[in-house]
A protein has these predicted regions:
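Short acidic, gly/pro-rich beta-turn/loop elements at beta-sheet edges
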Residues: 54-56, 88, 127
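Mid-chain, structured segments of secreted extracytoplasmic proteins
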Residues: 82-122
Length: 249
């Protein structure tokens, strides 16, 4: 994800990669092979374009008393276009991540406030387990709180000009985006900018939000006119650094 976050992730991956192999270690058991090509309808509370991609803290927000607080509260509505985890098909699976990155994610690993991963009701237990494992690699950070929930992602749609997703008909969550007008009628796309822990993506398609809301529990929030975009990323188990084999006794 963010610039500092990418650097921290890179250091962690490098440290794993350079651990010397030992002749006293047995071969590690084969991990489950997986792959996912996923499109995300995403929005957050930062002004357009989210400064978190270039800094170690989010934009400041002022309350009615004038006090400033830094946070990035976001909704990420995912749909796996094509994917699998071992023999488990993930084609068409939808899930939702609501989160707050907190005020400072300069650590290594980056520490962020909270996240809720909501599985669509149509998902099987095997699909939920698979998505949970894959997301741990997509979001390689330390959350202060990470929980799961279940809901109905009943709207997930987009065109060249707009995108919309709702959780429980909008009662639990909603993201509505509209394309920002560029020099032509084609979408504005930012490429070659890192996104969380994924190694490949097709670019940030800029679409400021008309609304982005998470309407569940004490951490509910709602913003209008702030950052939004769509992105399609691709990742597989082949992209992960191999884990060192356990030492023999």
């Amino acid at each position: 994800m963010r610039k500092a976050l990418f650097a921290a992730i890179a250091l962690v991956c490098l440290a794993i990669a350079i651990v010397p192999a030992s002749t006293t270690r047995a071969a590690a058991p084969a991990a489950t092979e997986w792959a996912a090509n996923t499109t995300v309808i995403e929005a957050c509370s930062c002004p357009m374009f989210c400064q978190c991609y270039f800094n170690t803290s989010p934009a400041g927000h002022h309350d009615h008393a004038g006090a400033a607080a830094h946070f990035c509260r976001a909704n990420l509505a995912h749909r796996i276009n094509k994917g699998h985890y071992g023999a488990v098909s993930l084609d068409g699976v939808k899930f939702w991540v609501a989160s707050d990155l907190g005020g400072d994610f300069s650590g290594n690993p980056p520490k962020m406030d909270w996240a809720v991963l909501t599985f669509d009701k149509a998902m099987t237990k095997e699909q939920r387990d698979a998505v949970g494992e894959i997301m741990s690699h997509v979001f390689p950070v330390q959350w202060g709180s990470f929980t799961t929930a279940e809901g109905s992602i009943d709207v997930w749609e987009y065109t060249k000009d707009a995108a919309r997703a709702t959780l429980d008909g909008g009662k639990s969550g909603e993201v509505k985006l509209k394309r920002f007008q560029g020099m032509t009628n084609d979408p504005i796309v930012i490429k070659n900018l890192g996104y969380w822990g994924v190694p490949r993506h097709e670019g940030f398609v800029l679409m400021p939000n008309e609304v982005e809301a998470y309407r569940v529990g004490p951490k509910a929030f709602e913003f209008k006119g702030s950052n939004g975009f769509m992105i399609t990323w691709d990742m597989s188990s082949k992209d992960l650094a191999p884990k060192p084999a356990p030492a023999k006794n």
